[in-house]
Amino acid sequence: KKKNMVIKMAENMKKIDKALYSKAVSIARNASLTVEEKTGRHPTRFEVETTVAFVCFYLEKCDIVVLETGLGGRDDATNVITTEILHIFMPISIDHSESLGDSLQDIARIKSGIIKNSAPTVICYRGDFNNEEDSPESIIINKCKEKGSKVYKVSRELIDNIKVTDSHLEFDILKNKSLSLDNTHLRLSMKGAYQPANALTAYMALKVLSESGFPVSDENIKTAFEKTKVAFRFEIVELGDSVDIILDGAHNPDGAKKFVDSLNLNYEGRDKIYITGIFKDNNNIIF
């Protein structure tokens, strides 16, 4: 189990040192026992894992931590952090309804709970609401106003000229004066149809950080996008003889749709065979 956990935890894409992990686990264990003694409740596995990660970040003196919530945001274990320098929201979709709610608006309310200070906020819009006041993003924006957080709104309207090659997906980010964006061409090693929106959001976030004094150049950004790969995000395994296996972790209706969009973008007109495994509580996914 310890070996598996060491593999699971990484710093700068490298497996963390076993001695560092052992020290972090020892600190987290003592803290967990103290919590149990004071409250009568032992922290959950995710809470303990989050504590271990935070201790590792502290011991390694990390400059920046990209911290993704485990479930929702407001009540998530990761939300104990109060020193955010940037908030980032991807398009909101229905997921974990039993905990987060049945509507996009309900989920947005819980997710917006990560906004606890005036650090800037980058939001990637869904773009499928006729009335912006009804959109889940409007709930996040209201939270930003409450906390004095400057909002940077990006959407697919800023994306143009998407092209797929054998090895990359390329697209243009259009110039936008209000966001201080210039015309920019990016090449991605990941070829999912949703990756341009992901990259646009990350690009905007990096530009905001660079304006805040973090040394991030356009050259660094472009190189990072060209080299970045994430397993099981429309991961293509080539077997030869025109046969490819696609590995993807889509686990909600929106993710399933984006997976099919990615297939159509990369394999239009090709025969396809689907092998799908779904948990019982995610039986609302339809391919």
How would you name each of these model-derived features?
Residues 2-82, 98-106, 134:
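ATP-dependent carboxylate-amine ligase catalytic core
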Residues 9, 75, 99, 115, ...:
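Short clusters of hydrophobic/aromatic residues that line enzyme substrate/ligand-binding pockets
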Residues 24-27, 31, 143, 224, ...:
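Residues that form generic nucleotide/phosphate-binding pockets
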Residues 35-41, 48, 60-69, 84-185, ...:
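Acidic, Mg2+-coordinating active-site environments of NTP-dependent enzymes
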Residues 56, 113, 265-267:
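Glycine-rich helix-loop-beta junction characteristic of Rossmann-like nucleotide cofactor-binding loops
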Residues 64-69, 76-88, 92-93, 106, ...:
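Nucleotide phosphate-binding/pyrophosphate-handling subdomain across enzymes
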